[in-house]
UniProtKB/Swiss-Prot annotation:
E.C. designation(s): 7.6.2.11
Protein name: Spermidine/putrescine import ATP-binding protein PotA
RNA-binding as UniProt keyword: no
Role of this protein: Part of the ABC transporter complex PotABCD involved in spermidine/putrescine import. Responsible for energy coupling to the transport system.
MF (Gene Ontology): ABC-type polyamine transporter activity; ATP binding; ATP hydrolysis activity
Record text on subunit structure and interactions: The complex is composed of two ATP-binding proteins (PotA), two transmembrane proteins (PotB and PotC) and a solute-binding protein (PotD).
Domain (ABC transporter) ranges: 6-236
Keywords tagged on the record: ATP-binding, Cell inner membrane, Cell membrane, Membrane, Nucleotide-binding, Translocase, Transport
Natural source organism: Pseudomonas aeruginosa (strain UCBPP-PA14)
Protein's cellular compartments: Cell inner membrane
Bilayer topology term: Peripheral membrane protein
InterPro entries documented for this protein: AAA+_ATPase, ABC_SmlMolc_Importer, ABC_transporter-like_ATP-bd, ABC_transporter-like_CS, Mo/tungstate-bd_C_term_dom, P-loop_NTPase, PotA-like, Transp-assoc_OB_typ2
Amino acid sequence: MTPPLLEIRNVTRRFGDFTAVDNVSLTINTGEFFTLLGPSGCGKTTLLRMLAGFDQPDSGEIRLNGQDLAGVEPEKRPVHTVFQSYALFPHMSVAQNIAFPLKMAGVAKSEIDARVEQALKDVRLADKGGRMPTQLSGGQRQRVAIARALVNRPRLLLLDEPLSALDAKLREEMQIELINLQKDVGITFVYVTHDQGEALALSHRIAVMNQGRVEQLDAPETIYSFPRSRFVADFIGQCNLLDATVEAVDGERVRIDLRGLGEVQALKSFDAQPGEACVLTLRPEKIRLAQSVTADSNEVHFRGRVAELLYLGDVTLYIVELENGERLETLLPNATPGRTKFFEVGDAVEAAWRFDAGHLVRA
C-alpha cells in the first residue's frame, strides 16, 4: 500500500483564546486533488498556511513524504502556494515571472529556458511568454501564477481561493483548466475555498471544516448525498432541513415524526433509537410537485400551496408552504419531456418524495 504524501496529525493552532485549528488529522495521497472547504473563520486558511510553513502548529505534526516539517522554512519545503492576488511582478514579462524562482535557486539558464517553456505549455500559454501581466486577462494571469508555482516541480501545490476574484463564467472555465492541469502534471493539489460548487466540481476528496474541526471527509458525491451533520447538509448546496423525532426502527427503515406534519418513513442512516431527535435532510431536486399524487407506500407526500417561485433558466425554484406552515424548496427542470404544467404562485399542489430520497442526521 502506497503511503500518503501528506500526513496531518492532531494539529492545533490557537491565537490567544481562539482555537483556529482544533486537533485536525488528515492524510492526502500523491496525485490527489484535495479541497479544504468551509465558511470564513473555519480554519482552512490557517491550516494551509501551516502546510506552507508560514505558520506553525501549537501541537501536532505535519509530515510530507515521511519528513516532519517542524522548523523547515517555507523556501526549503517542496511546496508552492498560489494566492488569490496572483502576486506577479508587473515589470517582468510572463516568461520572466515564471523563471524568477528558478533564477533565485541558481538553476542553469539552459534548464530555466526549457522548464519555462514546458510550464507555459502546461498552462496553455505557450505563445504568451513575451507578454506583460497587464496584457493578460484575469484567467491568464492566474495561469501564469500557477505556472510559476509549478516550474520548481514541487511535491505539493497549495491554492488559496485562487478563482474567487474572477467572474462566474471565467471561474467555470478555470475550473476545467485546473482539472486538466492537475491530471497532466500529476502533482498533489490542496485547494482552499468557501465555494461549495468549486469544491464539488474539482475535488477527489473534500474536508468540510467548521469551527476549526473537520465535520466530514469524503468524496464530493458522498458529501452532497449523504451529509453526516446538519451543518454539512446546510452548507453544501440547497437543502431542506426538517426537524423530526425517531418513533420506531424496522430494519433499514425508520418511522419518524416530522414535527407538525405527522409520521413518515425514511431510510435508516445512523444507529437511530426511538425518541431520538433527528433532522431529515432533503435536496430540492428530490421533491416532485403535482396537482394530486397517487398513494404509494414508498412515497411521502403533503399538501401545500406555491408561496413563491424563482425562474433560474434551466430550472425553477418553487417555495411550497405546507398546511402546517413549513416551507419546502423544490427545484423542477424547465425542459422536462412531456411536462406541460408550470405552477404559479397560489396554486394548490402536493409535494412528494420517495422515502429513501432524504437523509437522516442527528439533531
